[in-house]
Amino acid sequence: MQNFGIYIIGDEILSGKRQDKHLSKAIELLSARGLQLAWASYLGDIPAQITASLKASMERNQQNSDIVFSFGGIGATPDDFTRQCAADAAGVPLARHAGAVANIEAQYGEGAYPKRVLMADFPQGAALIPNPVNRVAGFSIHQHYFVPGFPEMAHPMMEWVLDTHYAHLFHQTKYLEQSIIVESGVESRLIDLMNTVITEFDVKVFSLPKLKPNPHVELGAKGAPDKVLQAMVALKAGVKDLGFTWRDFTAS
C-alpha cells in the first residue's frame, strides 16, 4: 500500500512569521481524489535535519511505499537548502538541468544569470515539475516531489503531479468515517470498549474529548465501509451499556 506524506520546510513556519497553508490544502487535494494523507512533518532550515528526513523516506521507497511532497526551500537564497539536501539524501550530486535552464531563460532572459539559474540545479537524474506561475520548475526524484513554498505555485504543481502520475490510484480504496457524540463521556471508561472494537472489526477507532461548553466525547471509527458500519453498531451498544447517552455527530 502506498502512503502519501508531506514535508513542510522553513523556519518562517516554525516561528509563526508565516502561517502554513500547505497541510490543509494537501488534505483537500488528496481527499478530492479519494486519497488520504498518511503523515506530515514540519522541518526547520537545518540541512542535517532535512537530509536525514528525506533519506529516511527515500529508503522506505525501496519498497515503493511512500509518495512524498516537499514544500519550500528550493530557491537560490542562502537559506534555501532543500535542493542540496535532496541530492545528499539520494546520494547523487547536484547537476544543472537543461530543461529547467531553458524555462528560466524563457521567463527572465538575461536576468536568468547569474543567480536565478541556480534554481535549475537539481539532484542528478531528477525530473521536472512545471510551474504555471513563473516557469521556475520544481523537481522529483525517488517518488519525492519538491515544490516552492509559495502556495500559489506549490498547490497547482501538486495537482499536476497527482493528475499526471497517480490517477490510477484515485478512488481505489473505499473508506468511511463515522462518529457519535457521547454525552458527558469519560475517555477512561471508553478505553476497553474501543480496544474490543479495534480487535473485532479491524478498524481505526478514535475519541476526541471536549470540555466546554458541554463536556462530551466524539467517538468513532474509520476504515472499510462495511467494517465501520459494524463497528459503529458495537460502539453505540457499548456506550449504552456503560450508562452513557449518545447522539449522531453532525459536523458544524
Task: Place the predicted regions along the sequence by residue.
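Short coil/turn connectors at secondary-structure junctions
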Residues: M1-N3, Q63-S65, P123-Q124, R135-V136, ...
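N-terminal small/polar loop signature for handling phosphorylated ligands or for N-terminal nucleophile
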Residues: I27-A89
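Short beta->alpha linker loops
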Residues: Y42-D45, G99, V117, G185
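An accessory alpha-helical subdomain
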Residues: Q143-G238
